[in-house]
Amino acid sequence: MKISYSMLTHNETDSLLKLIEFLVKHKDEEDEIVILDDYSDNEKTKEILDTMCSIHEIKFEQRHLLKDYGGQKNHLKNMCTGDYIFNLDADELPNKWLMKNIKTILEANPTIDLYW
């Protein structure tokens, strides 16, 4: 089972770096990190994204939001290749217990397609 950890970004800084580092440390090898950025103009954000995407295998694209949040989320979804998509805000960290057990939870509940 492959999970896509996906997020939309725009000018996040320290929280984005913490989240990427957390995901790299806690995701399984077959999982992916997917980021769609709304052309951040914050230099620190650009530096974080450039550095982390060059060090780690992160699927990254930039696309203008153009006041179309639904279109942005759909584009992000289409970038993902996992069996499940774990949508994150760039300023949140998933629980360590959840990261360790998410696949067991999903496998134990095969008829459920959405978790909140």
Which role does the model predict for each range below?
Residues I3-E12, L19, H26, L36:
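A conserved hydrophobic helix/loop-capping motif in glycosyltransferases and polysaccharide synthases
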Residues I20-Q62:
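Acidic donor-binding segment of Leloir-type glycosyltransferases
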Residues E21, E47, N74-H75, K100:
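Active-site phosphate/pyrophosphate- and oxyanion-stabilizing loops and adjacent acidic/basic residues
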Residues H64-G71, K77:
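A short, glycine-/small-residue-rich helix N-cap motif at loop->alpha-helix starts
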Residues N74-Y84:
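Active-site nucleotide-sugar/metal-binding loop of Leloir-type enzymes
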Residues G82-L93:
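Short beta-strand-to-loop acidic/aromatic patch adjacent to the donor-nucleotide binding site
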Residues L93, W97-W116:
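Conserved donor NDP-sugar-binding/catalytic core segment of glycosyltransferases
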